[in-house]
Amino acid sequence: MIVELSHPLIKHKVNTARIQDTSAEKLRKTLKELGFMLVYEALKDILLEEKEVRTWIGNKRFNYLNEEEIVFVPILRAGLSFLEGALQVVPNAKVGFLGIKRNEETLESHIYYSRLPELKGKIVVILDPMLATGGTLEVALREILKHSPLKVKSVHAIAAPEGLKRIEEKFKEVEIFVGNVDERLNDKGYIIPGLGDIGDRLYAVSVY
């Protein structure tokens, strides 16, 4: 399932991130805010659990989120920009990390680092600002699905139609939430118009 979110504030922040001379500091702040908004939307269907609590008029039962059932998995490096915002939505969620690198010649991706908590029966939310060819997300999903999660969601600021099609065809059970579906990929596998090299831009590694 693919959901392109229509909220005007999400569109505004995605387009703010496109501006070439946006400082690294402002870009990190913008992506943190996008992480909050996208995760908030992605968890709209989550089920609550009844719990008895003490109130000013005695013990009462209300519905609450079991935060420990949720696991955020940012894709290094750029996915870290979403993590702080995601944890503001669900502060007690568990966090795992996947480092996945794409070969810029073959466009194939491979895992170079994996540190995941228990995923069996959990709701996993993958955090990655961009979904381009879908190669990185495919590798992440294959790794995560080995551990029998209850549900997997993936959130992105932008995505290319080609990558969305690839993931939807191979992983029909995965829910993808995206701030904006961009035009296309270029011959190097970059999203057009995209965000440039978001990892480098976030951490002021280079100017493109």
Swiss-Prot record:
It comes from the Bacteria. Disulfide bonds: none annotated. 5-phospho-alpha-D-ribose 1-diphosphate binds at residues 77, 102, 128-136, 197. InterPro entries: PRibTrfase_dom, PRTase-like, Upp_B, UPRTase/APRTase, Ura_phspho_trans. One of its GO terms (biological process) is uracil salvage. It catalyses: UMP + diphosphate = 5-phospho-alpha-D-ribose 1-diphosphate + uracil. Belongs to the UPRTase family. GO terms for cellular component: cytosol. Uracil binds at residues 191, 196-198. This is Uracil phosphoribosyltransferase. PANTHER family: ADENINE PHOSPHORIBOSYLTRANSFERASE (PTHR32315), URACIL PHOSPHORIBOSYLTRANSFERASE, CHLOROPLASTIC (PTHR32315:SF4). Keywords: Allosteric enzyme, Glycosyltransferase, GTP-binding, Magnesium, Nucleotide-binding, Transferase. GO terms for molecular function: GTP binding; hypoxanthine phosphoribosyltransferase activity; magnesium ion binding; uracil phosphoribosyltransferase activity. Allosterically activated by GTP. Its cofactor is Mg(2+). Pathway: Pyrimidine metabolism; UMP biosynthesis via salvage pathway; UMP from uracil: step 1/1. It comes from Aquifex aeolicus (strain VF5). Binds 1 Mg(2+) ion per subunit. The magnesium is bound as Mg-PRPP. The lineage of its organism: Bacteria, Pseudomonadati, Aquificota, Aquificia, Aquificales. Its EC number is 2.4.2.9. It is an enzyme of class 2 (transferase). Catalyzes the conversion of uracil and 5-phospho-alpha-D-ribose 1-diphosphate (PRPP) to UMP and diphosphate.
